[in-house]
């Protein structure tokens, strides 16, 4: 599984994201420009320049018409993908930690960090996607959810499959479900800080099932990832690692999840990647067991994204590199012992 290595950022990666078709890969880092790449060959299509500092998050709408970025410069920017033009900028009261389009692309959520005296919020903006009036967006959000009432600031967020709920991860290990129309808290769950004795339980990533977004995975500094059902809001699976996890993703087609993380650079005594545990880890989604690792980064993995058709994945690291992997035949053919037995029984060979 030889990757394409993309060198387009001067500093650590913060998020990578595929568009719905998977032909484009979007990336942001702790520098001030986002990049758009062809995922098939790693050629850079262009850059989105306009932020004045670190860009924490990026997302693209279902039509690959618009993309949004949020950064430490207190700005949320809306871009036209076709020409890389910034069509609108919303001001934020504090650094923007996460942006995410609703499944229909009509709304955009943004997390404003709980710093500088600002109460942490999740704001929802209505998106006008008419080409003729892209610059005429509503300046004020249609909904503001204050997350302070949960006793902890929001770190990550995303939408349920029907767009009815906003799922928010917090730095105290809790996950909350809010009604996306009223902003009311529906329920919350402690997803991290209960599986081991780790003190840092901050949730670092949330990604949804690619098929229908009916369940999602969270990663945490507590060295675990959890799979949670959107409707019942119960923990389905727990994946235990040996280092703080920064990111987690669910693969389509095959029943796997991918975790990424590693010890923070300042805590690693040698530069060996095995020492810092800087590999992408593959777990069986059902059986919760680790089945393999992929090396390559020379620092913690900060973000992973899986190709929508399940043919590969991309990872972005603290080392400033993006690695685009295409799965080989051994990945596609891999079966757990229980799966192999079940398949043989179905075929009548045992």
Curated annotation (Swiss-Prot):
Q: Where in the cell is it found?
A: Cytoplasm
Highest rank taxon of the organism = Eukaryota
Q: Which Gene3D superfamilies match?
A: YVTN repeat-like/Quinoprotein amine dehydrogenase
Query: A cellular component term (GO) from this record?
Result: eukaryotic 43S preinitiation complex
Q: Which Pfam families does this chain map to?
A: EIF3I (PF24805)
Coiled-coil region: none
Cite the SUPFAM superfamilies for this sequence: WD40 repeat-like
**Which BP terms does GO give this entry?**
cytoplasmic translational initiation; formation of cytoplasmic translation initiation complex
GO molecular function terms listed in the Swiss-Prot or TrEMBL record: RNA binding; translation initiation factor activity
Does the keyword Cytoplasm feature in the UniProt annotation? yes
Q: Where are the WD repeats?
A: 8-49, 51-89, 91-135, 149-188, 198-240, 296-335
Q: Which UniProt keywords apply?
A: Cytoplasm, Initiation factor, Protein biosynthesis, Repeat, WD repeat
Family of the protein in this entry:
Belongs to the eIF-3 subunit I family.
Subunit architecture: Component of the eukaryotic translation initiation factor 3 (eIF-3) complex.
- Main function: Component of the eukaryotic translation initiation factor 3 (eIF-3) complex, which is involved in protein synthesis of a specialized repertoire of mRNAs and, together with other initiation factors, stimulates binding of mRNA and methionyl-tRNAi to the 40S ribosome. The eIF-3 complex specifically targets and initiates translation of a subset of mRNAs involved in cell proliferation.
According to UniProt, the name of this protein is: Eukaryotic translation initiation factor 3 subunit I
